[in-house]
């Protein structure tokens, strides 16, 4: 079994309450804990690349994510990422064609009892093991082509598009 590389970048997935005013900040990643709770036996390695809200990610951050992926021998990569700019990062990675790359995130923090984080991480693990090389986004119970998906903020969900969305 090929080892899956799991990169954490922050986002709502890893947000925690910061103070009594209900302000959130990105905390230490809970991905390893979630994988342990789910009794995942597939070999994987978790690497924290950064701890940022995805609205704070810039081209240099995307270049760093890209360089980590390209430097790794792993052919299967899962990335936990904030949902607001996940599609931007997907487009920035789209020309990496010899690996299976799956981005996922959460609409509420993984530390919350009612969260989609665990489900989305499970979807990402399934997709990364069964998909052809390319870049994908798993959210809302669906595996999307990273070039043919948008986040619909009015629905708080991801939706497929017929045509590729512009590359970065």
What do the PLM-derived regions correspond to, one by one?
Residues 1-168:
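Active-site histidine-anchored catalytic micro-motif
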